[in-house]
Amino acid sequence: MPTINQLVRKGRQSKVVKSDSPALNKGYNSFIKARTDISSPQKRGVCTRVGTMTPKKPNSALRKYARVRLTNTMEVTAYIPGIGHNLQEHSVVLIRGGRVKDLPGVRYHIVRGALDTAGVDGRMQGRSKYGTKRPKAAKK
């Protein structure tokens, strides 16, 4: 326990808050070729690799992911949500924050229905999360 005098001389250090999605907190100025501290809710990037990985125990599946080089020159691993996708190498995608609990190192999600990513086909519920357009009304 510190004395009052010790606290007066050197106060308590505040805790450092670590970001859940650090790649969204950095920008890039291409004129001076330097990183900036401008943050954004989403970022655009180009897929460098698309594949599947297996989740941690006790889950079992083949989860789809993409390695994405962002416009701020960082490279991150992003999860591809939904059933089926049209992504391949050099596809331009939009990523948002949000980790996948059973995939280590995956801290980002790809936004379905934006840029080169198509929405999920035949989806009726939760369409806005998967970039699916409203189905046409059936004729009477």
Swiss-Prot record:
List the keywords (alphabetical): Methylation, Ribonucleoprotein, Ribosomal protein, RNA-binding, rRNA-binding, tRNA-binding
Question: Which intervals carry biased composition (Basic residues)?
Answer: 130-140
Give a yes or no for keyword rRNA-binding in this entry: yes
Gene Ontology CC: one annotated term: small ribosomal subunit
Q: Can the keyword Coiled coil be found in this entry's annotation?
A: no
Q: Name one GO biological process term.
A: translation
Q: What Gene3D superfamilies does the annotation carry?
A: Nucleic acid-binding proteins
* Region called Disordered, residue ranges: 1-20, 121-140
Q: Name one GO molecular function term.
A: tRNA binding
What is the similarity comment for this entry? Belongs to the universal ribosomal protein uS12 family.
Subunit organization? Part of the 30S ribosomal subunit. Contacts proteins S8 and S17. May interact with IF1 in the 30S initiation complex.
Described function: With S4 and S5 plays an important role in translational accuracy.
| Protein's recorded name | Small ribosomal subunit protein uS12
Species for this entry: Exiguobacterium sibiricum (strain DSM 17290 / CCUG 55495 / CIP 109462 / JCM 13490 / 255-15)
Organism taxonomic ancestry? Bacteria, Bacillati, Bacillota, Bacilli, Bacillales
